Structure formats: structure tokens, C-alpha cells
């Protein structure tokens, strides 16, 4: 896997995720999104100039789009903390794509920003994502009660984090 900026043909994937609940289920579906919203953002800034920032996750062999990663500065902006997220197409789940994408995003953020901490939240029931985060070097830091509303009920989340010191040889970007 590798990360790259989005190209115009990639925008179809966003439209599919915005209109087809089956692609995001069971944990990623948050409701229908306005059609064309991501296209407008891509035309403005390539999905890299506004929050959340987004990069495409593609295969190395044939540059096939398999999902995306996003990130946003959190916890007192300017203090070096980023929240990340990942969404992988169903046919690539369980094959290491999410783990690789999150690992690559951590490497990217630690090498290009002064971030000291990167974190992610996932539903307590999302065992696959918990394993992917752990394989990517994250540690479980805690449980937040009632943070996600899905299928008519509030659900708990686990918070996972990684700090720059966890990765040997990682120093802030100049």
C-alpha cells in the first residue's frame, strides 16, 4: 500500500461511500452525505487544504484505489496532536490494507509535521480496527462511554494513541 493525493477519477469512491450504506457498514455509516461535496472540496484544494485532510490509499502494483485516510488537528490546535481515520473498501478489509494505511499515515505525519501525538477512536465492538491500530503501533489508552450513535443506540469507543517517542529515530519536522 501507499498513500497519494486524490485524482479526479478517485472521487467516484467518495460518491459511492456517501450513497451506499453497504460499503461502510457496520461501523462507518453515518448517513447519506450531500452528493458532490467531496468533488467541490477536491476542486478547491485537492482534499489537502481543509479539514479533514485526506489521502488516497492505493496498491503499489497497479495504483488501485482501496480507500482513504484522513486526519485533523485536535486537542488545542497548534499543540501537536492529530486524530486519524481510515476507510477501506469491503473487498480489501481483513487483508492488511487498513493496518498498512494507518502505519503509513503515522510515518507521514511524524515526518512532515511537528506532531507529538496521533490518536484514533474506534467503536468498542470494532475488533478488526482495534487489531489494525495495535499492529500499526498504537496503544489502547481508554474507553469513552456513549460516543457513537449507530443503529438506534449509543455505543462506547476505545481511544488508541501513539507518540513520537514510540517510534525510534522520529524527530519533529523542521
Task: Indicate residue ranges for each PLM-predicted region.
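Acyl-donor (CoA/ACP) binding surface of acyl/acetyltransferases
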Residues: 1-21, 54, 58-174
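Conserved GNAT-fold acetyl-CoA-binding loop/helix
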Residues: 22-43
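A short helix-loop-beta-strand connector motif used in the catalytic cores of GNAT acetyltransferases and
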Residues: 43-56
